[in-house]
Every structure is written in structure tokens, then in C-alpha cells.
């Protein structure tokens, strides 16, 4: 809360002492400031109070403002790894995948119009929304035969997100041997 809220509340003014309190009375009396990370005690929406003092004034002059904390759920996507498989047509361990084929399974019943789905080659990039896979509809794996890619599902309204993984598998084609010619006897003479 503190860093982003402090800047917005101070609005560029210097020499301000800003403290956060659970109740209006605590803010007015400068009691029980919130000094650590704060876990809301009222689900989804809670008002806390921000006390602001000018450190250059020797008298106890202060103002306070209400700050509404809004907690949004993260998307409840499918936590189990999805998988996509293709055949290794040229026996090199690489194949072309349409990652979007996993969208429905990953969304786990969520409305696709409310979420943005992006894919990444590692978990860190998925968490930070950095370096997405540019062509998820035509992605060639970068690790032969088996590779994990990560999917990030972000709520368009709240920007809350969740991640999961997808296993890509390139299946080797069966090795065939040329059979010997099959000789049959034509007992009925049809040819």
C-alpha cells in the first residue's frame, strides 16, 4: 500500500509524515499505525484511514483521508498441466503447435471475453508479463521432443492474473521396415 499511496496522497508536497490506521479514531489520535504489510480484515473491500502531518509545523496539525482497499480474486484457472502433442514428421524433435488449443481447458469455465491469455517460454516471464510468445497459433518448440510453456490468464477488468503450464510433446513416428512381398496363390483364378 505505502509506496504507491504515499505518492498519490502527497501529490508532490515535501515534508509530509504519512501513516495508515484501521479506524478513523486511530488516525485522529495517531494510535496503532499500520507499520508492516497489511492483511485486510474485511473481505473484498475495507476502508482504512491515512493520517498526514506536515513535519515543518511544530503544532499537531494533521489531516486524514479514507483509503478504500479493494481485493479482487485471481482467476481460478485449471492448475493441472495441460498438454499438446504433435507428430515429428521430419524426425528432428521439433513441431508446430497451436497453443490456443489449450485455452478452453486452461480457462476452466471462465468467460474468454473477460480474460487475456498469453504464453511464455518460462515461468518468470509469465509472472512478470515479459517476452510473450509472439505467435501462439504457430509456435515451434525450442527444446527437442518435450518442453514446458507457461500460460498467463489476466482479468481484463482487475488485472489480477494466474499462471499455469502446458506440456508440449513431439512424438516420434513409428519406424517401419519394408515388408517382404506377400505371395498368394490364386485358386479361384480372378487374378
What do these predicted ranges mean?
Residues 1-191:
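Extracellular low-complexity Ser/Thr/Asn/Gly-rich intrinsically disordered segments
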